[in-house]
């Protein structure tokens, strides 16, 4: 199959990478696993055993007229322990390489079908200026966009940092969440070739 390159001849690409069937279940599983892996998982609360304080019974069991109480660290009390205290945990989920690559291929194929993948010969700017990048994107009628280059262009990266709906990645930095998060994905010809090699 071929992908149309803006202002140039069509680029021949692999059917298995850019012409794959849409697999929603696989993409969902991989995206959930990716998001789970990004969780910090460091929250920690204290149980009644871990809260600092005396273990003495606050008042006698009977005769005061108050509700019976055996411990100031009881979860019922203010400043007491948490009943089912959260502990640090690893939320990451295992995803096989074949599944991960399959999900990326499926996303790329769907981007092609929806005309959301824009292939350009090169994507460069002369200076790390946000207004220069904004003008270049305006010329291509692009706004909410992920730009993928073969290697990270420092000028592009610096110019895009201040733009909320623009992100710049190299081929090694792409992930399923970023691919589906933007309205358009701009890829250079060299990046397309690298992606094919990476997913082969």
UniProtKB/Swiss-Prot annotation:
GO biological process, one term: translation
Stretches for region Disordered: 43-71
InterPro entries, sorted: Ribosomal_uL4, Ribosomal_uL4-like, Ribosomal_uL4_dom_sf
Highest rank taxon of the organism: Bacteria
Family the entry assigns: Belongs to the universal ribosomal protein uL4 family.
Quaternary structure note: Part of the 50S ribosomal subunit.
Function: One of the primary rRNA binding proteins, this protein initially binds near the 5'-end of the 23S rRNA. It is important during the early stages of 50S assembly. It makes multiple contacts with different domains of the 23S rRNA in the assembled 50S subunit and ribosome.
Name recorded for this polypeptide: Large ribosomal subunit protein uL4
